[in-house]
Amino acid sequence: MSTGTGSLTALQDCGVLQQKVPLAEFTTWRVGGPAQWLAEPTSTEQIPELLQWARERRLPVHMIGAGSNLLIADGGLPGLTLCLRRLQGSALNADTGRVRAAAGEPLPTLARRAAKAGLQGLEWAVGIPGTVGGAAVMNAGAQGGCTAEQLISVDVIRFSDAQPSLATLSRDELAFSYRHSALQSNRHLVVAAEFQLEPGHDPAELQRLTSGNLNHRTSTQPYKLPSCGSVFRNPEPEKAGRLIESLGLKGRAIGGAQVSELHANFIVNTGDASANDIRALISLVQGEVMEAKGIALHPEVKRLGFETPD
């Protein structure tokens, strides 16, 4: 597959491919510098063409969804940034409980649709500010539930091959563990996922449970300020938020980044935070917890564009 100037021009003309786009608006923390190239494909068919175009130019490729659990450097990202938030849509079978969703489908939207159809299993997901694709990659979870419990398979585009190719991976191939999957370390781009939910439940009851879960999250977590969601994985059996709070770190700030006064496992952007502010505050919290408790906190956050890894 060779991508000539004609197809490139067509992608630019329809707004799929753009240059020097600020990425702050693409992350829930509202920080991050510009993408050298940003692509927002509207169909799965456009993705192999974009990947091949980047490969022919030896450009690095970065993948983002809704931008939660993501910290992009102030200097931005070189190469091609693929954002899949426009790849939306889902199909639910109320009789069998089978659900198929595009990678960019917002997880709360899917959770509400499932509840309305009487399909049990995604009530926990209603307050997670991410996409189906991101949930599969991170094994997102909340309130005792997680993606791995309902996911059957994912459709991926392999871009490590000579030519980008489509494949389907089963749950067993994804090696799920707490907030982790094999998708975090391979060259696969999730474009769709399939779930098995439990059919035949009362939609009104499921919607009540879903609303209750959302109300609990919005009352205990800082939804009024930009954040990425939970910053650190829980070092079981401990809870990261409780450890941080026990050290009096709620309200601690560096620049415009602050440990939330409402929930200590959240770092919020109070208005003028930079990615460097947030990164420094993450390191500060890790250091304080290690010194006082001897416990290493590991971020859930994916960091892109930084010169040195944490």
Swiss-Prot record:
Pathways involved: Cell wall biogenesis; peptidoglycan biosynthesis
Classification via Pfam families: FAD_binding_4, MurB_C
Domain of life: Bacteria
Cofactor(s) required, per the database record: FAD
Heme listed as a keyword: no
Single Gene Ontology BP annotation: cell division
EC number: 1.3.1.98
Active site positions, chain numbering: R179, S230 (proton donor), E300
Catalytic reactions on record: UDP-N-acetyl-alpha-D-muramate + NADP(+) = UDP-N-acetyl-3-O-(1-carboxyvinyl)-alpha-D-glucosamine + NADPH + H(+)
InterPro entries: FAD-bd_PCMH, FAD-bd_PCMH-like_sf, FAD-bd_PCMH_sub1, FAD-bd_PCMH_sub2, MurB, MurB_C, MurB_C_sf, Oxid_FAD_bind_N
NCBIfam families for the chain: murB (TIGR00179), PRK13905.1 (NF010480)
Name of protein: UDP-N-acetylenolpyruvoylglucosamine reductase
Species of the source: Synechococcus sp. (strain WH7803)
